[in-house]
């Protein structure tokens, strides 16, 4: 019964993403505004995170970020649908985008050098990844969905352009890819629990931060780059950058990476996925997200 209902919803989803892009954006903003008016836990998480991360902003400035973030969240259904259901040709024809720094990635790929490509959780991360994968050979890491049926939809959608997807809990797959000269997308900016993490500052607050990246880089001998994404009006911008983080220890490396992600978020704070409980393991999910 659940799968039957889900199949109907997926069919409806595939239909609405056939709408012209301008109409999608209009309906997305309408959905976002309705979400903004509603009382739900994701709105609460977003509001709490923005308050924690921008203590120096006045309440009106934080409110604007929060409101715009929730309204933009309404577009996720369309951006993700485009990423999972559209063809490469249709995306190239209908979605304005620009990739800066692609040559940095292509340089390593031509040399058959593995690349751990860090990125942050933007609201449009599925579309970001799809567009990059249209233009370069990319592999990904994911958290499996609880629904087996939806997991198949998610995986098939991501594999439209990506060459492979690995479960984030099974590092052996993407470690092998990196050793074999592949490029793997990797987002370290969520709370995956304290057991596999270190407490490292994020916006000046202790946050459970995955400690694996430097170990993976050292073990595989791969290089690393950073992908930052944001909108300039209707054009999606993807910047491929080559930062340098301290290799002295996993903690110092991740502190540098967290600060780098912070700086990118501050440029377009309304486009970040604030709906995740980033500080649940360190500040207490029952205490601050209740």
Predicted regions and their residues:
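Membrane-anchoring hydrophobic helices of lipid-metabolizing enzymes
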Residues: 1-116, 153-156
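Non-catalytic C-terminal accessory region of glycerolipid acyltransferases
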Residues: 38, 106-111, 134-135, 169-290
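Surface-exposed charge patches
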Residues: 48, 130, 156, 215, ...
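Short, structured helix-loop boundary elements
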Residues: 63, 151, 251-254
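Short, flexible loop segments at the rims of nucleotide/cofactor-binding pockets, characterized by
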Residues: 91-97, 143, 160-165, 202-204, ...
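Catalytic core of membrane glycerolipid acyltransferases/transacylases, capturing the structured
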Residues: 111-168, 194-196, 206
């Amino acid at each position: 019964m659940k799968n039957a209902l889900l199949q109907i919803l997926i069919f409806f989803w595939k239909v609405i993403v056939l709408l012209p892009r301008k109409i999608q954006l209009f309906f997305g903003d309408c959905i976002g505004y309705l979400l903004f008016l509603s009382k739900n836990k994701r709105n609460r998480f977003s509001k709490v995170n923005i308050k924690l991360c921008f203590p120096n902003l006045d309440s009106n400035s934080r409110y604007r970020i929060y409101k715009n973030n929730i309204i933009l969240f309404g577009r996720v259904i369309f951006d993700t649908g485009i990423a999972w259901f559209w063809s490469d040709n249709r995306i190239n024809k209908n979605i304005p985008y620009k990739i800066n720094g692609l040559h940095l990635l292509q340089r390593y790929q031509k040399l058959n050098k593995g690349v751990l490509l860090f990125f942050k959780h933007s609201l449009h991360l599925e579309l970001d990844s799809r567009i990059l994968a249209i233009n370069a050979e990319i592999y990904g890491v994911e958290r499996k969905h609880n629904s087996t049926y939806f997991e198949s939809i998610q995986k098939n959608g991501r594999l439209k352009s990506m060459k492979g997807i690995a479960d984030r809990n099974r590092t052996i797959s993407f470690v092998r890819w990196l050793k074999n000269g592949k490029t793997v997308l990797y987002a370290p900016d969520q709370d995956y629990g304290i057991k596999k993490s270190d407490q490292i500052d994020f916006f000046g607050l202790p946050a459970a931060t995955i400690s694996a990246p430097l170990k993976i880089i050292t073990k595989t001998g791969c290089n690393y780059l950073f992908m930052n994404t944001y909108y300039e009006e209707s054009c999606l911008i993807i910047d491929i950058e080559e930062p340098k983080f301290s290799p002295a220890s996993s903690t110092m490396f991740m502190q540098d990476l967290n600060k780098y992600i912070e700086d990118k978020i501050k440029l377009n704070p309304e486009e970040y996925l604030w709906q995740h409980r980033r500080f649940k393991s360190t500040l207490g999910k029952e205490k601050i997200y209740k």
